[in-house]
UniProtKB/Swiss-Prot annotation:
Residues 1-82, 427-468 are annotated as: Disordered. This is Pumilio homolog 24. Its main location: nucleus. It comes from Arabidopsis thaliana (Mouse-ear cress). The keyword Repeat applies. PANTHER family: PUMILIO HOMOLOG 3. Residues 441-455 have a biased composition (Acidic residues). The pumilio repeats mediate the association with RNA by packing together to form a right-handed superhelix that approximates a half donut. The number as well as the specific sequence of the repeats determine the specificity for target mRNAs.
Amino acid sequence: MSSKGLKPQKSTKRKDTDSSAKFDSLKSKKPKLVSGEQQQHVKPKFGKPKSAGDKEQSTNLSKKERRVQAKELTEARKKKRKPHYNLEQELVSLWEKMRRRNIGKEDRSKLISEAIRKMKGKVPEIAVSHVSSRVLQTCVKFCSQAEKDVLFTELQPQFLNLASNKYAVHFIQKMLDGASKQQLAACISSLRGHVAPLLRHVFGSLVVEHAYHLGSAAQKQELLAELYSTELQLFKGLTTSNEKTVVDIIAKLGLQKGAVNRHMTAIIQPILEKGIVDHTITHKLLIEYLTIADKTSAADVLQLLTGSLLLRMVHTRDGSRLAMLSIKHGSAKERKKIIKAMKEHVKKMAFDQFGSMVLACIFSIVDDTKLVTKIIVRELEATLKDLVMDKNGRRPLLQLLHPNSSRYLSHDDLAALDLSVPSLCSMDKSETSSKTKDTDGNEIGEETKDEQEDTVAEHSDHEENVTAMGGKKDPLVRRQELLVNSGLAERLIDVCVENAEEFLQSKFGNEVMYEVAIGGSDGILCPSLSEKLCELYEAISSVAAEPKPQESEKDSEHILENFHSSRTIRRLVLNRPGFASILFKKALSGKCRSWAQGHCSKILSAFVETEDVQVREMAKTELQVLVNEGTLKISATKKPE
């Protein structure tokens, strides 16, 4: 067939152009590798372009050389950023020499003088650097008074600005430590009108606290006064040293209590919110605030303090009082929160002068004895020996053995335990004026019931904060549960038996030993632990029965001749006939003449002066001879203790 007459047929295949376009769209957008000759140099978006020579030079450098090069670049950047960079480097080199311990005083003095000469006119700028501020601190520590005056002159105009700086604050504290009375007064005057803002600042508060700590009573009052009222902040000299509290100041100046309350609230609230509560001036401010605060404001502040914040305050006099007030006026839930926050911190608190009083307050108030036993008592049991021998550590133990004793607690300590918030205390008295019995047999007030019903409907979480001071349990029952039922008393007696001689001769341990030996106040240990107490009497008598140490043994002293132990044993003879009988039979019978002089004579005279007839008759035969001879002297007016 011929193909001439045939028409050309259309191709049924897809066009190559369509398929090629789709194929190109699926291709990777990453450019293919090309030879070095075909590559074009693209300018970098940032910084100066590197030349080919620089690249070759950097690739040819060793690792050590690259580090040196990077260090040089860093140094160059620091020089541009810091105007006194070279000076700082010079000061650091001098500092490395002057801070050595083996350097002579004259050499150090020369280095310090040179450093101060280099810094002259630039002290405020240098003080804000983390490196050079250390140089300043060392200079202030070892320089002469004339050099301190030079530094202080430069510091004074920039005092407030530097007070809020992270690094300069340490230099300022050193300057305040070495400041004269006039210089300290000038610094405190510079703080006038700025105390409240600085107390809200993390670093500024350190300067205010340091100045408050170093200042006199009048200067402390000056710093505190402007926190009470706007008038006291603006005008100087409105108060004197006679007005020691905010209540006295309000009475003298005729200020409005509500205005003072609002002013103090505005200052205190941000301080508590930021958690800057470590300073004594803040603790004093809070204590003063609670004396004038209304019921709602006082309850709010105490509620904010519950928990970990309170642990940071118990190391000061006013801080520990705030903790006691929080425990007294807090609800059961808040007390539980406070005690749980003390976990693993009880030992440290017990050895602290003021923290130990917080533990004593808990033992006197909190009714949840299971929680107190679990967290506080168990931690105290682990260090009983150290607690007994420590001046502060014995206080919680003595509070359980003999509560609120003026023999062991000072007047200030007893006043702290009796402290309360006036606005919350007045409400407590009105609530307890009419009491009824609830289903558990506990006494509660009718007004308390009404208020509880109202608070549930309106604002229960807030009003729950305000409760009656102290617990509902009988104090004797609470002591029984904490001391005897918990096993603390038994463990304490065992420790006393093991360390009888050491405790008796200790200035502080002998008092705990005495209270344990007599069975505590109200004889709380006697019914259930009488056998254990007899073991203690035997242990003391065994130590007393030991022979006198030889004259060559000057370091050792017999417990009958020791000042502290002889007084303690004498008191036990007068007050515990059972102990007196064991001691006389085991240690003194037939040996009274050899012990009739020195401190031991007071113990022998106690056998004659005791009110117990059996003890007197037991020792009469042997002691009466000594009395008649004049060897043993008995005071005619002396009465049994």
